[in-house]
Amino acid sequence: MLFTSYGFIAFLAVLFVLYYLIPKRFQWLLLLAADIVFYACAGWKGLCFMAATVVVSWAATNLMGASLAKQKAFLRSDEGKALERAERKAYKKQCEKRRKVIFVLALVADLGILAALKYTNFLITNVNALFSADIAAVDWVLPLGISFYTFQTVSYVIDVYWEKVEPEKNILRVALFTSFFPLLIQGPISRFGDLKDTLFAEHKADFKQISFGLQRILWGYFKKLVIADRLLAAVTALCGDPSTYTGAYVFIGAVLYAAELYADFTGGIDITIGVAQVLGIKVKENFIRPYFSRNIAEYWRRWHISMGTWFKDYIFYPLSVAPWLLKLSKSARKKISDGFGRKLSVYVSTIVTWFLTGLWHGAAWNFVVWGLLNAFFILLAEEFKPVSQRFRAKHERLVSGFGYRVFETLRTFLLMCSLRVLDCYRDVAVSFRALGTVFTDFNWGEAFSGGALLQLGLTGADYLIAAVGVVIMFAVSCVQEKHGSVREVLWEKPVLCYAVFFVLAVAVLTFGAYGVGYDAAQFIYNQF
């Protein structure tokens, strides 16, 4: 059930009405039923894999919770207090070891399902290439949203193991947390501790929050249908024929793809957060105007925030303080240099984190290379940080000016566009060849003469509509960057508020890419 389908709109309308009509204590159960219906539309087989993840996560967290409760109760008892210090320590270690076994088995089961379904053919392809083997590929369909809900449940299992959250005893609530349908398509990857207070709560109809939610949904549809799906045809044409469209076309394609991806992804997130807001559920923001970033590190603090914090909290930080890596760093300080040894754990953790980030995005080498290149530029920026700081101190007036900010923002934007070429062409060699032609075969005249751009599946009117849409999106981002929520600003002026969103609704209905004969496009992050 696509977010852009008429069926989904009808599904939401029925859900919203029922949600506030039924007794409030049953609201979360209605959401669970809605999740099952939504997911079943994508295939019942996927429900089986999700159910397995739910059962494993629920059982593991409750077993760990029971073990911890038993440990604490015993140590508080007279028998526990009578133990010697060494005996108490040995008992705690034994209990911790038992919990660790449960924890590891749960991670292996949850991540094993994801790995088997998503990466088996990738492994087979590479084994065949390396050893000239002829292993047949498996015909497995990747369940909808498996990368998102797996990471969500894994974070829950880890947080229980780390004693950050209490285990949820009701398996149906764990099922709702895992399957909450607005988050399934493209996140945000939410934490149990952040979501539980509003996900399972009883909600009264709040006119302001419902209005804000519906406005957010409408804004998401504007981005998706008016901008992203309109630009899709040109991006597909440019990336689909890299031997013909070289030089300036590659540059144009990368910029168009950046606009399409941003409108597509943030549009989907707007719909997600809007749906949750109508239901009274708070979901964290996943984007904070990333194209305003002045460096790559800032960009990744603003883009797909939930993914970045997941990898930072559960991969980067634990790995950087892992005993074996600290030991390796200590050895490097003695044998190579003190500076290198101090940085080694950060370097290794960054590279591993971004390797896994790339692999999470897709089972293909272009995504792996994309991830490693992000790591390279992040570490390169870190190495040049002292030089940058000296330059800023020496030219304080220059770097504080608007022009220098624009320069840094454009530099970061173009760097990210260059890296996304790997996503556009889906082949490492083709991507680098295409990018190389930007420097060896760049010809603006070829791209802008004789109506060349009109041969890419878009008319002049399409380009104009998309351009106006991008300008509106940029203007809204500027207001958000300076004043925060646009909806809060407009809410103080009701007439203007309703006028703006009436015009937005008309724009979606008039200029949106939908309707009879329209091949509805999946959100780009569906594939992940």
Language model features: what each stretch is:
Residues 1-527:
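Membrane-embedded transmembrane alpha-helical bundles that form the catalytic cores
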